[in-house]
Amino acid sequence: MEAENHTTVAELIILGLTEDPKLCIVFFVIFLGVYIVTLVGNISIITLIRISSQLHTPMYLFLSHLAFVDILYSTSVSVIMHMELLGHGLALPVAACAAQLCITVSFGSAECFLLAAMAYDRYVAICSPLLYSTLMSPRVCFLLLGMSYVGGCMNGWTFTGCLLSLSFCGPNQIDHFFCDFSPLLKLSCSDVSIIGIIPSISSGSIIVVTVFVIAVSYIYILITILNMRSTEGRHKAFSTCTSHLTAVTLYYGTITFIYVMPKSNYSTEQNKVLSVFYTVVIPMLNPLIYSLRNRDVKEALRKATVRVYS
């Protein structure tokens, strides 16, 4: 009977990064620039890998899919962010908010799986080079890619299913710049004791499994590199891993802080800053990390530039 006294909320209002009109304009210009760089950088990586035969290897196949995921991941958040900055807030139906959450979580989770697949690829290339063509055959590569997307979608649907099972009948203002699960949970008038735990278990499992794969891969890589007699061989092996390690450290460091650390350890504003970093900034940085610190990509870019202007 108590539920009948509540009015069901039809739409949710995303407050955004700030309510200051002047800051909204500044942030809009900054993040529009970041988004354009993200699109140009990741599309360039995908195009370069497609047109450069020397990059037709499993490592760069995974990198092209990482760039594709980064485009969709960033877009799912950036479009809503720009709309709310222009309108000083944004009203979305609950279903639209659930769809945005599903897309963001799906591609964010797929990125975790892709980073783990890339670590395994580096492990095979450095520790078992003679078996590389067998262990990283096209069939294995597409299986790893399929698992990445399916695993990401399953986590996305877990979050979405939990969100759609909640009732919203009180305050409807989300103190965030996109439909993230934790702020939505605070607005619900349902019992969230179990619903609130399920997404944490799902995301936590993905983080633990993928970090385990990455850590074990790099432990074996480090042992193999330290046993190499050639200094040049060590340097070459290290250089193929530094870009990936940088991307892993940035991404996992941020999402672990947000989703694993107790919420009492940081404020809502700090949560927004960290969320901006892993949803908007990191997708922009990944192409720069993999192009500026990768000899093969730089060489392929040089050849492509020569072909264009010759």
Curated annotation (Swiss-Prot):
UniProt topological domain (Extracellular) ranges: 1-25, 76-99, 155-196, 259-271
Source organism, top-level taxon: Eukaryota
Organism: Mus musculus
PANTHER family: OLFACTORY RECEPTOR
Residues that carry a glycan: 5, 265
Residues in the Cytoplasmic compartment per record: 47-54, 121-133, 218-237, 293-310
Physiological role: Potential odorant receptor.
Chief location category: membrane
Membrane association type: Multi-pass membrane protein
Coiled-coil spans in chain: none
Subcellular location: Cell membrane
Disulfide bond entries: 97-189
Membrane spanning residue stretches: 26-46, 55-75, 100-120, 134-154, 197-217, 238-258, 272-292
Name this polypeptide is given: Olfactory receptor 5P53
InterPro entries assigned: GPCR_Rhodpsn, GPCR_Rhodpsn_7TM, Olfact_rcpt
Family indicated by similarity: Belongs to the G-protein coupled receptor 1 family.
Classification lineage: Eukaryota, Metazoa, Chordata, Craniata, Vertebrata
Keyword Cell membrane: yes
